[in-house]
Design a protein with these regions (language model features):
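Short, amphipathic alpha-helical interaction segments embedded in low-complexity terminal/linker regions
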Residues: 162-222
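Glycine-rich phosphate-binding loops that contact phosphosugars or nucleotide phosphates
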Residues: 16-153, 162-166
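Predominant activation on well-ordered alpha-helical scaffold segments within soluble catalytic domains
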Residues: 6, 46, 71, 98, ...
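Single conserved hydrophobic/aromatic residue that forms the stacking wall/gate
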Residues: 1-8, 12
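Generic structural signal for well-ordered, non-membrane alpha-helical segments
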Residues: 12, 63, 67, 94-97, ...
Length: 222
């Protein structure tokens, strides 16, 4: 979809996801996968949730109703007009998100949003709005269901395609993944075996010496 492509282009800057409840958790989840999967710094995509880290596990009363707190959190992280703010809210009416997006636009910062409600107040604050129509939830008002699933898919599309554009993927391989456990060391070793035709032991030694599949392959070919 052209609006997904536009948000993908926006995300080549440093980006902030903002949401409350399920929407906020999904933003934090997607942002947290960027360093281990693609080997990029954790500041490239930052997920902010109303109520802070406590709200990842437990509801924080009235946190999403604070229209000023979102922008305060962005300024605490030294946001600039070279960054992007993407609001996530099924209803498109979350004050925490809308307030942050409004102030971002006032400061010349590019904004986008993902919502399930057409013509929402949040979309009115977005330079690029993705409005996905998912229909009624199976349990009325429980937007963690169809809306949450749709949000997750769109976030995946945006960040994955951005990482491909930035050269952090080769083919369909995570060549810049962090080697944080034995499974990933084994996976990376097998990628090198496939790419360079080395035996497993040499490939593993090369991987551990250089720290990533891409660096190991590039170093071997110099």
């Amino acid at each position: 979809h052209p609006r997904v492509r536009r948000q993908r282009q926006m995300c080549i800057r440093d980006s902030f996801y903002m949401g409350a409840g399920t929407s906020g958790r999904l933003g934090v989840l997607d942002a947290s996968e960027i360093p281990p999967t693609f080997g990029m710094p954790p500041t490239l995509v930052i997920g902010l949730i109303a109520g802070g880290d406590t709200a990842l596990r437990n509801p924080v009363e009235n946190a999403e109703d604070d229209i000023h707190r979102g922008w305060e959190e962005l300024t605490e992280r030294n946001i600039t007009d070279k960054d992007t703010v993407i609001g996530i809210a099924a209803s498109g009416t979350t004050p925490y998100v809308i307030g942050a997006m409004h102030e971002a636009r006032e400061h010349g910062i590019l904004t986008g949003c993902i919502t399930s409600n057409p013509d929402s107040p949040m979309a009115a604050e977005a330079d690029v709005a993705i409005e996905m129509i998912v229909g009624p939830e199976y349990v009325t008002g429980s937007s963690r269901m169809k809306s949450g699933t749709g949000q997750k898919m769109i976030l995946n599309m945006i960040t994955t395609s951005v990482m491909i554009q930035l050269g952090r993927v080769k083919g369909n391989k995570m060549v810049n993944m962090q080697l944080s456990n034995k499974k990933l060391v084994d996976r990376g070793t097998r990628m090198i075996v496939e790419e360079l035709g080395l035996d497993y032991g040499k490939a593993k030694a090369l991987l551990l010496m250089h720290g990533s599949v891409k660096k190991a392959v590039d170093a071997y070919r110099i």
